[in-house]
Amino acid sequence: MKDLLKFLKAQTKTEEFDAIKIALASPDMIRSWSFGEVKKPETINYRTFKPERYGLFCARIFGPVKDYECLCGKYKRLKHRGVICEKCGVEVTQTKVRRERMGHIELASPTAHIWFLKSLPSRIGLLLDMPLRDIERVLYFESYVVVEGGMTNLERRQILTEEQYLDALEEFGDEFDAKMGAEAIQALLKNMDLEQECEQLREELEETNSETKRKKLTKRIKLLEAFVLSGNKPEWMILTVLPVLPPDLRPLVPLDGGRFATSDLNDLYRRVINRNNRLKRLLDLAAPDIIVRNEKRMLQEAVDALLDNGRRGRAITGSNKRPLKSLADMIKGKQGRFRQNLLGKRVDYSGRSVITVGPYLRLHQCGLPKKMALELFKPFIYGKLELRGLATTIKAAKKMVEREEAVVWDILDEVIREHPVMLNRAPTLHRLGIQAFEPVLIEGKAIQLHPLVCAAYNADFDGDQMAVHVPLTLEAQLEARALMMSTNNILSPANGEPIIVPSQDVVLGLYYMTRDRVNGKGEGMVLTGPKEAERIYRAGVAELHARVKVRITEHEKRDNGESVENTHLVDTTVGRAILWMIVPKGLPFSLVNQALGKKAISKMLNTCYRVLGLKPTVIFADQIMYTGFAYAARSGSSVGIDDMVIPAKKAEIIDEAEAEVAEIQEQFQSGLVTAGERYNKVIDIWAAANERVAKAMMDNLSTEAVINRDGEEERQVSFNSIFMMADSGARGSAAQIRQLAGMRGLMAKPDGSIIETPITANFREGLNVLQYFISTHGARKGLADTALKTANSGYLTRRLVDVAQDLVVTEDDCGTFAGIVMTPVIEGGDVKEPLRERVLGRVTAEDVLKPGTADILVERNTLLNEKWCDVLEENSVDSVKVRSVVTCDTDFGVCANCYGRDLARGHLVNKGEAIGVIAAQSIGEPGTQLTMRTFHIGGAASRAAAESSIQVKNKGTIRLSNAKFVVNGSGKLVITSRNTELKLVDEFGRTKESYKVPYGAVMAKGDGAEIMGGETVANWDPHTMPVITEVDGFVRFTDMIDGQTITRQTDELTGLSSIVILDTAERTSGGKDLRPALRIVDANGNDVLLPGTDMPAQYFLPGKTIVQLEDGAKITGGDTLARLPQETSGTKDITGGLPRVADLFEARRPKEPAILAEISGIVSFGKETKGKRRLVISPVDGSDAYEEMIPKWRQLNVFEGERVERGDVISDGPESPHDILRLRGVHAVTRYIVNEVQDVYRLQGVKINDKHIEVIVRQMLRKATIASSGSSEFLEGEQVEYSRIKIANRQLENDGKVEMTYVRDLLGITKASLATESFISAASFQETTRVLTEAAVAGKRDELRGLKENVIVGRLIPAGTGYAYHQERARHRQQGEAPAAPQITADEASANLAELLNAGLGGNDD
């Protein structure tokens, strides 16, 4: 009995392990795994269906086919277990050992493992320092390779052709040793002395100077060191023994009709065994060399195909012309082991059905069809039936359930009570795609869903299906209830706003209920309270929209927690008073006292959550929904064709537009405008006409004239159904109404260009055939786009999740003082995002001071909640330094303070929260709403791009930042610096507007000047770039020789002559080295010095500059000396939407990036080459100058002799994030990526919190390149995980050694995912073969730190509720004791025993 118990325990035992290591398998290791050699290619006997002996399914090697029964049937039953039958040699045991027992094949000739040969860079090639071509020629028996040169002049590893080999044989006899095939490569690898080779390479590395050579050497050193450290031997990359997969993993299944379905692997193994046996026979017979060679080559190819079919040459195909699936194909790709079976599995206790509305459900409930519930909860029902004694055995209980006896339904009710189920709608784009509900049993076959959770699921009721899952264990039920219940997920994790918001009918009902009407029935009544309002409405004395006075009692919560009553008479409507009855105590009446649209309702719920907490909000949301539905039904809103009122002005607007178009057409025919201009103008005209029609229509729809009580006419907001739906935000938008009742407007061709004939009709009038045909383009493109978009968005989400999956909150506070400075996002004249929204829920990194004083307003390490944000706003704080995950100092993971508030819960984030995955979901989920197209800018948009002045909108004070300027003759400021910013500050010191001011702009007002709204502050010419003098004096030309460096041009109309500097290419040979410039001299002819320096004022003129002064002309500071014409950038395509977001996260370099100054210093231009000019920046302190070649066609923003700071823009263009990181640092690149990504989402009206994007940026910055290695064991130029560098440097500092220096790297998300420390995670993402090959050679250990690795090995993840378990394990590991094995109680043991005996007795009771 005792050993039976022990046996039972052994069956259920799981291995406890802390890490997984991958390495090369030595031949001895493969033999030790194996249970016997497979010698024959046969599978099973087709008559008896028994496996053939020594074949691929042999029972001797792999174990019995039936449980506890040997093959010949001599031993059966449990009592013989462990016996090996003497007749058929099969061990009597469970048949499941056929899933784990391996076999092996002894290869007659060694073969190379194709992964280490062909996976680039070729590991064998790198190790031997031989080109892949040569190695292949040796392996596939085309050439010889010298293994030992002996005393001859032949080098080791030299390749010999057949002829050369024969010649060498004649010359040297057996002095040397040359071989071909895998034996040769194996011998070379065996003879390598890794340590010595390493030493040699290190010496070479010291001596060499060339960059490419260094790179090559470092690569080899790294590989050799990996071999030495991991204990792998190079010759193990050549196989002499081939392992055979257990047979149940490559099954052979009989189909009806005597045929068999088999796994492709069996075919591949058969080929190997056949060729191997043939080769053995040929070797025994001592066959001619050429035949043996051919057979060896075929064996090599067979092994290649088995390991990775199609990697080399043509893929081996099966009988149906389809390539066979090799071992490598089994694990990679979407259908491979990782993604199909380890990361996502199908689960038991689940079902799916169509969803319908459940408007009467509470928020935490869902309707579950009885049929489904009965099936899903079967085990619980059986248990209950047995417990109650209603059924004696499980079998009897089964029968009762199948007969659906009355008592079963009662039991089902009991079982289901308080047992949450999880509902999931595919695609699950964020964590709110799976939520838990309490089931309510319903008749019918459709699941009923609460309408308010539809927004989170993105579900509608047009045939969507949802899946139900049952959490079985107590822990799972607890987690479902405490964490996943729909009532706990009121706020969206992406932006912290309510996601349980009413939409459509509910919004329309509430909007209708809270609207007011002039002269409604019962207007002017005075009521005692909401109760009376409802009474008179129900009695029909007053209507819903009547304006009345009502006595309202508000409850205000004080800071100390007590609530104060406050009663007064309010002007409101009957409907609003009725609605007030369901509003929870503690909210102000002003929330309800307005026409409630969707935004207002959302705000109301948000306020409720922040003020009163979760429970009242949930109840309130439900009440809102019931009320909304009720009054939507009352309102009887419907859409009729008469509701689409066409404006009377439409015809005349269209006639005007057509007249304008005709005029342009005439101009075009008489040659006054070009074809392009005509096209652009026509489109502009029609776009404007469309706007005018739309405006007329909306004015017409949105108000109506009524007679009030005094008999006068008054305008009030319209009660037109279509208008109400759009205005409340229930359905439809102004743009859609415009198509119904205005004009449809311009349409686009499939290629994205706009067709110039607009559709002047609308849907109410109806389209004619041509108009309909033009419309079809757009409609089809829309559908095609959507399909593409979904796939692209899904892939972006997958990459984001993969890069961020292992980021978890691991400690409370890392104590860093670093952070990022937050300011409001201001573009031109509008505040796009106020400071409040950016810092809400963040933690301050340093004390926030009251502006203009030294008083501390907010202490360091304060979580900024709504109250603190109010304080900041009252004191008009303009910038706050907050903690950020990018600057967090935690080694693995981040700390709670750097992350701030958990957006979905509204308090500081908990330890163990998987913030990486949340961030990835929040960014990826709205991906499908982004556009796919690149915007071609033409027509209206391109002309707006050339701005020439700044006009402010508000009144306030001007502030100029990093500005240099001179005052010109007329007393105006002229800007002479490159990146000047103009900010408009209001009287509280808050920035309201911000603009970039270009070089050469003339400012009407200076720094600190007061200004009124609407004033123009700065002017400039957008088409030329001026050269401006900073001093007074006289102009003196240098190196300006007519015909050599300049030419004179006279304007025919004005007769003015101007000088044009020739481009280097146009100059004669004499003028090539001359540098035309303007010097400024005083009256005595001495150089004038630039103010504050000892440099003479001289301005070098680049090619194509126009000078309109004569030599010796008198000038004053601020005058324009010369102008450089700027080509106005033509129509550039702006990448927008999803592709732009992907580009940013992949950190792709733009096509023509902006050129930034690498160091600070003085600009000069060196010798030019044919197509490029040489830019030299000389530092002021006289250290080495920096040179860079820049293509001639790039327009430069700097002149010779100007001073630039590191990171300044030298030539405009899109900035490359890598340059920003290198020259301006981590904060700048974070700010750049966050702002650029936010711009794309903001355009679509999607709100995402900045910190999610910062989380991804942190992951993109997780590698650094070592600049100098100090006393560490890292190599220079090696790319290492940033956390490892930090830990190593801390260690070095403690030991008093030299620390290493490093440069942070920015990796794109795909690269960063593949470069993670965990090979399991990387392999399950992309390029499985390459990742596994690299990991095996390096003998990598996976510490299983991330989420993905733990999911794959089937453990609790180190996040959320699994975080504690992992902490506990880590603690035990430090104390050096394993957690105690779970104790088995006596009851469990006897139950298990009964089960086992049943199995042993063959008692199948089905």
UniProtKB/Swiss-Prot annotation:
Disulfide bonds: none
Enzyme class, spelled out: transferase
GO BP: any one term: DNA-templated transcription
UniProt entry tagged with the keyword Zinc: yes
A GO MF term: DNA-directed RNA polymerase activity
Cofactor: Mg(2+); Zn(2+)
Residues that coordinate or bind Mg(2+): D460, D462, D464
GO cellular component, one term: DNA-directed RNA polymerase complex
Family: Belongs to the RNA polymerase beta' chain family.
Function: DNA-dependent RNA polymerase catalyzes the transcription of DNA into RNA using the four ribonucleoside triphosphates as substrates.
Name of the protein in its database record: DNA-directed RNA polymerase subunit beta'
Taxonomic source organism: Sodalis glossinidius (strain morsitans)
Encoding gene, per UniProt annotation: rpoC
